[in-house]
Amino acid sequence: MEFIIKSLLDTDLYKFTMMQAVLHQYPGAQVEYRFKCRTPGVDLARFINEISHEIDGLCGLCFSKEELDYLRGLRFMKPDFVDFLGLFHLDRKYLQLRASSQVPGEIELDIRGPWLHTILFEVPLLAIINEVWFRNTSVLNLDVGRDRLDAKVRLLKDESGYEECSIADYGTRRRYSRQWHAELLPLLAQGLGSNFVGTSNVYFAKQYGYTPLGTMAHEYLQAFQALGPRLRDSQVAGLEAWAREYRGDLGIALSDVVGLDAFLGDFDLYFCKLFDGMRHDSGDPFKWGERIIMHLESHRIDPRTKVLVFSDGLDMNKVMRLYQHFRGRCRLAFGVGTSLTNDLGPTPLQIVIKMVRCNGQPVAKLSDSPGKSMCDDPGYLHYLRQVFGVSADV
């Protein structure tokens, strides 16, 4: 049986854009990531040998000349970074996988090492765990997936007024299988037509000629909590470092690392003018959008010149409701994940890999959705909330 991950490009674009910034600005940073399955009663431990075998396959991959040439053709990729990738591979020594000694059936997966050399682990590891689980616990029925996908496409296309609704695939980490992902994308592109604007998956963007999409993830801004600036200034430092790296390119800022209130407090006139827009990934998307628009208007910036990207737990119905609510008031884009890549019948797994430490210090995300925060140091979490004025229910 061939390995699940066949290319190091089979990941999200923002892993490469963050990795490039790390190479240029923080090549010595040391980090720790931790896996968590939020779905109760999932016995992953019985498949630990299979998962381990797939990880061995992942760590045997390197970038081909064709893949490096593709990356070199992306306007925001610097030659020295692509040259570095030509020498790169994922090293198993940075990863520890074992059955949990605390909870029967659970696995413990920790990644520790240089940020530069571990940042590419997350997405393929999650894709591996998903696919190993589903191929052992369910029967693949692509007809169900095709029928459900067709229904979603028709839901949008049969209604008028959605001609400029931009939808992208953000579903690599939660996909049912690589096979389904590979089949789904051409079907989605054909069905949606001009509504389909690309995918976060670099491998499939290259294979099918789609636009690869993505800027930054939570880990990027989280790391700045331990990279030198005063904690209260960490988010500003992260955004300024991004601006130094990309000089106005890749200008979508993530708004929920320490909550929306703190983000808006940091996102001053300079950032409002510099960045192209913001991405929503937790909390009520309607309230979030209204507050973003109000914030832009308070700085005398026309919201219609900025893009609001929604990417939190979307399905086609939610996309359409959000589009109707905000259309004409700002530019809009929607990144749909699990609803596209893992809707074949079985219940999708809620699994994540999050950065929990950087340079030996705890880091955390205080999202706008209760229960989505993840940190291994309760004292630090309390301090972080205190510094950014975030209540204890997130």
UniProtKB/Swiss-Prot annotation:
Leading EC class: ligase
Keyword vocabulary terms for this entry: Ligase, Phosphoprotein, Pyridine nucleotide biosynthesis
Pfam families: NAPRTase, NAPRTase_N
GO molecular function term, any single one: nicotinate phosphoribosyltransferase activity
InterPro entries: N/Namide_PRibTrfase (IPR041525), NAPRTase_N (IPR040727), Nic_PRibTrfase (IPR006406), Nic_PRibTrfase-Fam (IPR007229), Nicotinate_pribotase-like_C (IPR036068)
GO biological process: NAD biosynthetic process via the salvage pathway
Post-translational modification: Transiently phosphorylated on a His residue during the reaction cycle. Phosphorylation strongly increases the affinity for substrates and increases the rate of nicotinate D-ribonucleotide production. Dephosphorylation regenerates the low-affinity form of the enzyme, leading to product release.
Pathway named in the protein's UniProt entry: Cofactor biosynthesis; NAD(+) biosynthesis; nicotinate D-ribonucleotide from nicotinate: step 1/1
Positions where Phosphohistidine occurs in the chain: 218
Reactions the enzyme catalyzes: nicotinate + 5-phospho-alpha-D-ribose 1-diphosphate + ATP + H2O = nicotinate beta-D-ribonucleotide + ADP + phosphate + diphosphate
EC number: 6.3.4.21
Cellular component terms (Gene Ontology): cytosol
Entry function: Catalyzes the synthesis of beta-nicotinate D-ribonucleotide from nicotinate and 5-phospho-D-ribose 1-phosphate at the expense of ATP.
Family affiliation: Belongs to the NAPRTase family.
NCBIfam families the record matches: NAPRTase (TIGR01514), PRK05321.1 (NF003704)
Family annotation (HAMAP family): NAPRTase
Name of the molecule in the record: Nicotinate phosphoribosyltransferase
Organism: Xylella fastidiosa (strain Temecula1 / ATCC 700964)
Source taxonomy: Bacteria, Pseudomonadati, Pseudomonadota, Gammaproteobacteria, Lysobacterales
Gene symbol of the encoding locus: pncB
